[in-house]
Amino acid sequence: MKRSIRLLCFLYVLCCTVFVVAQPYAIQHLGVENGLSNNFVLSMAQDKRGCIWVATEVGLNRFDGNGFTVYKQHNSEIAGDALNTLLYDEKEDVLWMGGKFGGLCAWEGKSGCFRTYQARNGMKLENIVHLAKANDGGIWITPHHYDPIYFDSRSHRFTSLSDMGIQLDCRSNLCAFADGDLLYVGHYRGGMSIIDLKKKTTRRMLHDPSVPQSLPGHSVYSLYKDRLGHLWVGTEWGLGLLDSSTGRFTVFRHVPGRISSLVADRVYDICETADGKLWIACDVGGISILDLSQITFKHPEEVCFENLLSAVTGKGLSSSNIRKVLQDSYGNIWIGNYSCGLDFISHRPPVFQICGDRPVYGMYRGEEGQLWVGGENELLLYKNDSLAKRFDICCDMLCSYGWVAAIIDDGQGFLLLGLSDNGILRTELRTGKTERVPMGIRDVRVMTFFRDTDEKIWIGTVLGLYSYTKGIVRKETELNSKLEEKSVYGILRDRQGKLWVGTYGWGLKVFDDNNRVVAELNPDTGFPDGTVNSLFEDSQGGVWIATRAGLGYVPDTRYPERYSFYGYDHGLEDVFIRAVQEDVNGEIWISTNNGISHWDKKEQKFDNYDYRDGIPMGNFIEGSACRGVDGTLYFGSLKGICHFNPQELDTSYRVTPVQIMECRAMDGRTGKGDRLILPEENGNIELPYDRNSFRITFSVPDYAQNKRIEYAYKIEGLEDNWVNIGEESQMVLRNIPPGTYIFRVKARLRNGDWDESHVAAVPFCIHPPLWRTWYAYTFYGLLLLCGLYFWMCTYKRKLAARIALAAEEKRIRDEQELNNERLRFYTNVTHELRTPLTLILGPLEDLTGH
């Protein structure tokens, strides 16, 4: 009873919802042209790394914020290409998937590998159409033609309903939802079954055309329980809200001709977003959004939905065949289409908006928020950023083609339109009637207007200066005689009363009240550029000079020669300055060829914005800029009006932490499918010396930031400096020498600071070849020691032998010398003895002879 009362109260407020047409969503499309394997999307899931997984009829896709990685049977171990459903288990980091194949397939996040589980004992596990979480952490598997099966993800055991003692009357299933002891099963052409797993009872709910509060249709495609505890049921004939105590449904259907009713009756998916809104995916219709927080009572049929339609029937979705809606952890909305891929809605609407898609030249802010815009052969009036009126000025032009280069209010109820090669037209604001203003020359090109303090309007043309007073145009002959270059692009009067005139090729001249030249800024006087595109006076009285070589600034107009000049060195990505404008906080914004830039006074540098921030890619126009009453800035370009409110730019917006997505070896043997490198148990990547080239992919998974991200990396152990690689989200490391390194990468939003607190890192080691390993060097050392030992031993033996030989030789020499000495002694003794004997024998012989 209490549950019924709560439901009635809920319906009381729900049915009183006031339909409000919200601002259109900025929707981006992703399809096969972006790398998606197939445009027929059936299911989506997000893993804890922030990656979006997309199941299609041909392949599984992982989107990492930059691009898709496709998994098919030919390049992975996935069980099949034709997928139906996905379910991610964050605790175990496993993505479960079912499809038109046998078994339950899983992708394991820790290993990056696929694994397929098959049922035993004849249990049928084919064509799985839905996977749902069980209350105990298991999974309820819904095959299309067989009873739901419970899968214990820890023990990997399958249990059928018949094993539990439960029988179902209908075996053609579409979805299931577990709520405590109850299991809700949606059937195809068979209504819905409510199974009490504890009591082992089954209750069948069918569509009865004679009972308005019965199940809305015969086939139940989706089941969802919101945060308030209400069960929503999507069928082929509408959306039902179940009162479980009575078994009755409150039914919501499409009412032809009523734009705030459910967009279509066939409901394939229901998703509740963080802001308490139900996003209802309808086939052949689009998406209906129901805000449950803003409600009063009338009648259930008067409940109002906000509807998103396809691009064919309105503005928005790329297809009306919606199968799945997912809100990721960042708050973005992902929409799966059955024919056109994915639609993406960012959680942060773009600050920079574009009105129209045709060239915009002159621009002027009128009264009551009016914005007058000059186009090609036309004058446009915008109110609240929407086109309110269009004036065709072809009949009053002197030639068949021209554009409105400048616009100004003459203060007499007319708008002056300065045309290209067509002089000046005057449009009456009250009637819209247009007439030509005589200038004394037929086809002069008007470039700019400036209203002086005395209501005199100065006119800059390619033939010099003119002035407009009370409907009469006069050529300023005296001033023109002092202009070397007659093409006047900028005019203003400073606070001292001096007239500043910027020309196309001769820089800037400053005149006093007596039309005397008091200052000149041109290349001859040292000014960097002589081509002035426009002039602007800020709220402090300073003058900004837009040139083709940068931005000049004269802070004190009493001293025109004292100026600063800003270019590439100050952070500008493009120095061709088109127009200058100031916001309500006194900040300076400029348009260039490539985009829009903001001058940061504190940092003395420019912040740059371009097409990646939503700015048109076409060139901006000289002097085409103005500020709205609410502070919105408008810049004219060749691709429409770019407008934004600088106060909506959140400079505190932080970049999502960068993630290392994968590493792949570049061994050249597998072509595009390079081998996936899996980290070891210690988290390190280990590679041999002959596979020392590999690719590291990293990304910021939040796609809302994708186009605004810049990366920097360094490799500790190889280099110590951070290298800014811009938008590049992968690094190819080639021929890394053996060693231990750490690859680090950090990210930032463009114009922001680096996120030093979330630096992603992956350690890797390049193992040396066998002959360069430590044990090889140990062996080399031992071998060297052994060689040294043997050498020393040999040397010692040689030295000993040499010493012994020397000793022997010395002994022999000594003996020889001793013998020689003895011989000499004996010889000497003999000689000494012989001499006296000879002396004795001689006389004796003489005596004997005689």
Annotate each predicted stretch with a short phrase:
Residues 1-768, 772-793, 838-845:
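Carboxylate-rich, polar loop motifs that coordinate divalent cations or form catalytic acidic clusters
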Residues 52, 231, 817-818, 850:
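Histidine kinase transmitter module recognition
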Residues 789-805:
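Juxtamembrane interface at the cytosolic side of transmembrane helices
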Residues 804-849:
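Primarily the dimerization/phosphotransfer
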